[in-house]
């Protein structure tokens, strides 16, 4: 049950909500839509659901053009941020509503609803009404109702936005398994990049109504098409750069010694020998650095400035004396313990794990974040 979106455009007066967006969602896959507020994510979901019309373009569901077909004939469920629960029905009645309309037997309805109540951890509120529920509970009820009818297609707008911590992590893992087991093609909007990377088969990045990049999470994380996509998906660490308009093949004598050392280092400049350093910014992800506490002649010594303990990682603020370079690197707690840091006076050693740059962006065209 695939979804094809072809050159979909939508405007509100002079404001372009969506600008010729095209993407393909393979059957039974989960696609995550990411982008800043106002990028058109929710608007695109509403057009796919048939709740809004597009000014131009087409929506194809499993090979059928449904652009002008009513929502009720699209075999689709959706969960939007307003939940839209029936106020006069209990939680149990809300979830079973679609099943009763479709004429399922009482036993099948009971089994299906009870299973979803337990999996989503809302069995204890099954006879309460929406007005008695918290935002997180309403969100789970809406999700259970959308899953109960076993749709071919599922559209989710921030399905776990009102949840925190362990419950959110548990339900995201459960939902991914459920969608795979029941072969439901899904498009999910989320502002949680980590959630998108862990759940989605592919990620789509939108900005100002335009699709910037689509691909597998690892590909987008490792090889973002531009600086905006790179920094949006996670921390980018910019390496030191020369201030002269030169190439790596022609380092002038007036270049500061520390930067000359950096520029000549074959580890750092492996594949950009023919590019003008002054016109590009070079970046690495935190995991592409190797940090050691033992002396390593192939690594660069660094000073420890601060250590900040976070919930799932430790943030190291370091200073590379030889390059006059401040950098921040998050590492896991086990990796931090392996460093055996006993004092801020202790010297660490750092080097890139890779001998190529995966990310180099022209300064003038990609320096802006918004």
UniProtKB/Swiss-Prot annotation:
InterPro entries, alphabetically? AAA+_ATPase (IPR003593), ABC_SmlMolc_Importer (IPR050093), ABC_transporter-like_ATP-bd (IPR003439), ABC_transporter-like_CS (IPR017871), P-loop_NTPase (IPR027417)
Q: Does the keyword Chloroplast apply?
A: yes
Subcellular location(s) per record: Plastid, Chloroplast
Identify the keywords attached in UniProt to this record, alphabetized.
Answer: ATP-binding, Chloroplast, Nucleotide-binding, Plastid, Sulfate transport, Translocase, Transport
What EC number(s) does its UniProt record assign? 7.3.2.3
Main localization category = plastid
Broad class of enzyme this protein falls into: translocase
Where is the ABC transporter domain positioned along the sequence? 3-233
Which gene name does the record give?
Answer: cysA
Q: Name one GO molecular function term.
A: ABC-type thiosulfate transporter activity
Annotated ATP binding lies at: 35-42
> Briefly, what is this protein's role?
Part of the ABC transporter complex involved in sulfate/thiosulfate import. Responsible for energy coupling to the transport system.
Q: Reaction catalysed?
A: sulfate(out) + ATP + H2O = sulfate(in) + ADP + phosphate + H(+); thiosulfate(out) + ATP + H2O = thiosulfate(in) + ADP + phosphate + H(+)
Which family does the similarity line name?
Belongs to the ABC transporter superfamily. Sulfate/tungstate importer (TC 3.A.1.6) family.
> What name does the UniProt record give this protein?
Sulfate/thiosulfate import ATP-binding protein CysA
What is one Pfam family matched by this protein?
ABC_tran
Q: Which organism is it from?
A: Marchantia polymorpha
């Amino acid at each position: 049950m695939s979804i094809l979106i072809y050159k979909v455009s939508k405007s509100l007066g002079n404001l372009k909500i969506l600008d010729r967006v095209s993407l393909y969602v393979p059957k039974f896959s989960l696609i995550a839509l990411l982008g800043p507020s106002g990028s058109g994510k929710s608007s695109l979901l509403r057009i796919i659901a048939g709740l809004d019309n597009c000014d131009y373009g087409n929506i194809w569901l499993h090979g059928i053009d449904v652009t002008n077909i009513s929502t009720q004939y699209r075999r689709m469920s959706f969960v939007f941020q307003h939940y839209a629960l029936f106020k006069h029905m209990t939680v149990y009645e809300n979830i079973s509503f679609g099943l009763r309309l479709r004429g399922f037997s009482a036993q099948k309805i009971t089994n299906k609803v009870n299973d979803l109540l337990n999996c989503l951890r809302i069995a204890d509120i099954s006879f309460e009404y929406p007005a008695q529920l918290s935002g997180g509970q309403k969100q789970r009820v809406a999700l259970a109702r959308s899953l109960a009818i076993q749709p071919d297609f599922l559209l989710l707008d921030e399905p776990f936005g009102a949840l925190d911590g362990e419950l959110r992590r548990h339900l995201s893992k459960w939902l991914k398994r459920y969608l795979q087991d029941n072969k439901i093609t899904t498009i999910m909007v989320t502002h949680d990049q980590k959630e998108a990377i862990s759940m989605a088969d592919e990620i789509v990045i939108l900005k100002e109504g335009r699709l910037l990049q689509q691909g597998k999470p690892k590909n987008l994380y490792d090889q973002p098409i531009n600086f905006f996509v790179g920094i949006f998906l996670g921390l980018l660490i910019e390496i030191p750069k020369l201030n002269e308009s030169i190439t790596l093949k022609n380092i002038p004598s007036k270049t500061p010694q520390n930067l000359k050392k950096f520029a000549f280092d074959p580890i750092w400049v492996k594949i950009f020998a023919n590019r003008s350093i002054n016109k590009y910014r070079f970046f690495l992800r935190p995991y592409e650095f190797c940090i050691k506490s033992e002396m390593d002649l192939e690594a660069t010594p660094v000073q420890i400035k601060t250590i900040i303990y976070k919930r799932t990682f430790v943030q190291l603020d370091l200073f590379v004396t030889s390059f006059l370079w401040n950098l921040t690197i998050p590492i896991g707690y086990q990796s931090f313990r392996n460093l055996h840091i006993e004092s801020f006076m202790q010297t660490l050693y750092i080097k890139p794990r890779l001998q190529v740059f995966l990310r180099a962006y022209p300064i003038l065209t990609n320096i802006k974040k918004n």
